[in-house]
Amino acid sequence: MAYGRLFKEIYQRALMEGLAKLAQVAVVVENIEEVAERWARLLGVPKPQVIETEEWEKTRMAFRGLPSRGRAKLAFFNLGGVTLELIEPIGGPSTWSEFLEEQGPGIHHVAFVVDDMDGTIRKLEGEGGVLVQKGGFEGGSYAYVDARKTLGAIVELLTFKR
């Protein structure tokens, strides 16, 4: 299944106004296959398919304001209203590789699906957040705002074309 369609299916129910509904908690890991197997065992569910983010030519990813070819392997556990995402950086500069390098494996971000990406970024910047990464995927786009100093978390925003 294509990356964008998978995202849209998982988050279709999470479309909302503002940041009222948490859609995802994401964990950066060093070995996604091993960690996904452990989570599957713990949750009593099948291990999800591991997918890779698309190339820069499709994502147009920017990290800290510069084009980046950073990529990652992803796995998603749909836990009802919230998804657990596992992320293994696989090359190039990114918020994922920076986090893993600086802090080791751990909770990387919380995500919300929003209708107004730019307005929500401005709102988070008004709360002391800094846009660190953004890009696209088939059917939508994402942005990471680092608000750890003021909100205690990196916040991911997801939006989908309708």
Predicted regions: what they are:
Residues 25-27, 85-89, 111, 123, ...:
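A structural feature that tracks compact, well-ordered secondary-structure segments
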Residues 3-4, 154, 158-162:
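Acidic/histidine-enriched, glycine/proline-rich intrinsically disordered or flexible terminal extensions
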Residues 53, 82, 89-91:
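Histidine- and/or cysteine-centered catalytic micro-motif in compact active-site loops
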Residues 2-17:
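Short acidic N-proximal helix/loop "leader" segments that mark the beginning
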Residues 17-20, 28-80, 119-143, 149:
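Core segments of cupin and vicinal oxygen chelate
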Residues 96:
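Zn2+-dependent peptidoglycan hydrolase active-site motif and core
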Residues 22-30, 74-83, 99-116:
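Vicinal oxygen chelate
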